Amino acid sequence: MRPYPRYHRRPFMPARLLVMLALLAALTSTLGASATTRQSAAGPVYGGTLSVAYAGGFTSFDPAQAVGYDWVALNGTLYNGLYQFDRHGQPRLDLAAAPPAISADHKTWTFTLRKGVRFSNGMEVTANDVAFSITRVLDPKLKPAVSWGQSYDEIFQGSVEYATGKAKSVSGIQVLDPYTIRLVLLRPTANLPDILASSYNFVVPKAVVTGESADYFGSHPVGTGPFMLQSYQKGVQAVFVKNPHYFHPGKPYLDKVIAVLTVNPGVIALRIEKGQLDGFGWYSDPTPADIQHARADPKLASYLVPAASSAASWLDLNVHEPPMDNLKLRQAIAMAINRTRIVQVRGGLAIPAYQLFVPLMPQYDRSLDQHPIYPYDPQRAAALVKASGYHNQPLTLFFDNSVPVDVNTMQAVQQDLQQVGLNVVLRGVSTVAFDPVEIKLRGHHMDLSGWSYDYPDAYDTYGGKLSCAVNGAGGLSGAHYCDPTADALVAKAQALPLGAGRNALFRQAQARILRAATEVPLFYYATSILVSPRVGGFYFHPIFAWQFENYWIKH
């Protein structure tokens, strides 16, 4: 899910809300291992309205153009795909009626659709709608804001030719009959279900979309999801009501969901306590002062639900900008940064990181965090700086300065690097200006980056941020580094079924990137979400945060 910018998401929330979130570290032990789920003695209850505040406004409910966590999360209430992410972030069959028939070479997947599934306007879903929806992400005329979605869908035969305007259709997306679709891949892709469950591949009605402009459909969406959009006031609120045609029996429990878009973040916590709101759509980072305040108010504990982190933060070291082409200098930077201090600066809502894959991924390598390739060693870092031949030239570090705690974090990193003899100049820019393509044109040496996954698999991180394919013009790599051997390991992994063999190859590829020190891991985000106790069945969804169809209002 691509926020602003996708590779380093952190929406800002002021102090009062941050106080709530600061309780995460103190409460995890008391809430226990099931803290991401709120238990309820009573079963589901039908009816009622749930109101959730979101930090930003929405410009499109079109899944092919939705950018940012808030947009993607709410689109999850309107649409379905061939697969859907379950509460653990694993893809499960959704619009697909049965597991696909997969060819011996693992490049042809044939799906049969559920019959009788209808869009909220009553039209039945057919294979033509599915083919249209996937193809549309690649449409060069649409120019979707989710270019990251386009890059993931360039796995089908003929996808690149279509996306570049050289073909009128995608040869690898084939409709066999009204309920059967065949997808032919360029190469085996073991995690295709993850890609098909992602929001940009949600299914939309071809007849409706082709009859209207993209802008119109973005504010008048038609989907198959548990809810449908009743009304939308830009920058004010979006009201969703139960979809009478929803195909999962007994769902949803709620009659209505209201996404409130204009609440002053500073009063959200107070409004939740008063029962005027039921929760906040996402999370952010507190300061140490916020933590101290929260610990003095234990009454707020019942409103906080911790969640496992889906994001890691790191520094990109631009190998195309001397002296960052010097391995010894990059190694010095990797060993100079005190990650324990960063955790303190971020109020405890971070975990030291020495790798790029987050703990929720099956390819996460625990040994790298226990025995880092480049451990914290400022003395050795200083020696490497001298050995590199560095002569005090300014090194520019770009970062998004819209979040105060990120500013504090970069100041701490700057101090660490200065202590080993590096002349680091911070250049904080606004969220809008912090764009990787623009940064490439400014001769940066380093930038604060990272990745927040669309699904918990290493291919999401590697393919979107680390591969050779994304280090050129228009790509998201700020390091501009290409390791063909690592790419070959990932290609080999993608040809294997999910499991230990595939995971091991991803770990080997990651180790090569880490040894090159083009990406310097800093921390994993420690997250939480604020929820009213009256919300029944709540759990934190690792992709959408809120999965409204499964919640109810306690009476």
Where are these regions (language model features)?
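Short, well-ordered beta-strand elements
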Residues: 47-56, 108-111, 130-133, 181-183, ...
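N-terminal lobe/hinge region of extracytoplasmic solute-binding protein
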Residues: 53-104, 135, 220-223
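Structural transition elements
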Residues: 227, 324, 348-387, 401-408
